[in-house]
């Protein structure tokens, strides 16, 4: 699509528009594999975003407008300054100590949850495989054992899907886009409540045991984030309790940090990788980071990993590196520098396969979303059953048709690894084979993902044929594509690792025929790293997690090399699967760098001009009317020059006149022409519109609910020049507790206001934010984006050269 098309130009019967950003435009989504391609048709808009053109429909922009931003930016007002000045040293120490205590509790709870997940999955898998083995040994036909295997998988899958239906859609999939969105500054309803966390945990237990090709890492990231949110806020809508005494932590900024700690702890406990958990959250999760957050996150990861290890090993005196998933790989073999070339080639293969996976999976999820739109959840349950049946067939019948191989033909096999008496923990599976033989395909498919990875990473040679590994890789690659996004709790980290290790070992087997010193297990490790880099596009955290999982620091260089090459190769075609899922869910996510097209725009071209301003002293009737008629969550507060020019207004008529002058002009929307910045200065002599602060909707609602009003007689005693004589009927502690509580809707607040109250006034100055971030209307939109993103703003007031309010920038104007 050409970038020269003007807005409104029709191309081939469809209205393709070059986006001219204004206050009504929302974020874009990428529906294509290559830039500029429209895969889905319809009326769409193309804009430049980082590497590619993104496609977004009007419906997408409307859906994104439903999200609200969080208030990460600290509010600087008079009551907060007074609280800070009077705050004792021991109170600061108690708050710091409280944060460390909460981080400890988060780590302990996440570790216990991880232990419950591991043990529950092992028990369910053991029950299933034991019954399959029992019927296989007693029945003359193979279909009875298959029906038992299928029955267990269907039962587990249905329970997992039903739990999502009961606990809500937030319990499905990985939940990582929602966590990333919240940590970026987006309020996502019900993402971290107790009901969602519990539903996702139990759904993950059954989906992970159902034979579906999925992993626990994404759900554990979400579960950990939910635990961090719940334990730090000391309130729950599900359990209907709220401890106001912990108000000091009940703000968006502290909640964000505790969610980061919990999310990182979830990854750390799942993989037994505390450093990897911290780096995963830093690289892939959190948008705001600090040194203090690094310490607390690492501490939470340490506690979570130790707790999980303690329970998994059974309280013995020795500490092992246990996690939900543990692996082993060769430690004696070292690579040669000539092998770096095939390692780079494997990185390219992993990048290509990862990019194809991202593209096809996004297309499948678009189709899935379109197919099930406005339909009963029964259809989603039917899809779960269909995928479970397909996965069961793929896992069972190829194993039935596979050739048996003698155990004696395996070199380097540890004695006792094929114990027929062991059920769910078999490394080599004797399925459909005589004594002394094993089934290579069943070893990969009729077991847990953990056991499959262990045997693929094993240094023992001649375990698998090239045909087995190729068939397994193709089948699981396709199954992962159609399973990711299913209506159950699921992740893709471990499936990608298993697929990559399979074709990596295949390459190692091929090269070992020509070079006797080749160890296929090392190529399995490099293949796993390449595959994950190609689909997830992580770098540092991925390398550290791989090394911590396999305890193979001697292979750090080839792992880094393959990860970097895989990421670079995948980035040529599309972005990571997580970014595409964010776009698919219409989350207005702000990346660290502004889109390229914003460099050519000014703030005036993007700002919303429908701005409602409030005076420093606002009439109750005016404030109530604005809250009832305007959905905005932030209102610029403008100065009353008539008041500031008279230090003592003892004349009540003069005071009323000064107040009414601004209240009567309050509904002026400051409409300006976005294509002509000079028009923004038409009101440069209007002294009634000078910015002096910002008041939030929630703050204004608290003032109305508490009836913190002033009569004209009360206002006469205030010195508007020196700001002395403020009436402060509520302090910072009480005000913060009110903000943390559930604020009733405006129609309920209006019932509390009497006719006499309507003629009263609200002095906003003690409560409004003096440190409001503003920007000139002629500034670059790219600079506005960076300030907005780095500071974590919810609102950015746009002013002209005379400090007059002319517009407002919000998240949706910058996407």
Swiss-Prot record:
Stretches for region Disordered: 654-685
Regions crossing the membrane: 97-117, 142-162, 201-221, 262-282, 297-317, 340-360, 381-401, 474-494, 506-526
Gene3D superfamilies to which the protein is assigned, alphabetical: CBS-domain, Clc chloride channel
Record membrane topology: Multi-pass membrane protein
GO cellular component, one term: intracellular membrane-bounded organelle
Localization, UniProt: Membrane
GO molecular function, one term: chloride transmembrane transporter activity
Topology feature Cytoplasmic, residues: 1-96
Keywords assigned by UniProt, alphabetized: CBS domain, Chloride, Chloride channel, Ion channel, Ion transport, Membrane, Repeat, Transmembrane, Transmembrane helix, Transport, Voltage-gated channel
Its job: Voltage-gated chloride channel. Chloride channels may have several functions including the regulation of cell volume, membrane potential stabilization and signal transduction.
Family as reported in the entry's similarity comment: Belongs to the chloride channel (TC 2.A.49) family.
Gene behind the chain: clcB
Major localization listed first in the record, in broad terms: membrane
Taxonomic source organism: Dictyostelium discoideum (Social amoeba)
SUPFAM superfamilies, per the entry: CBS-domain pair, Clc chloride channel
UniProt name for this protein: Chloride channel protein B
Residue intervals of the CBS domain: 607-714, 768-815
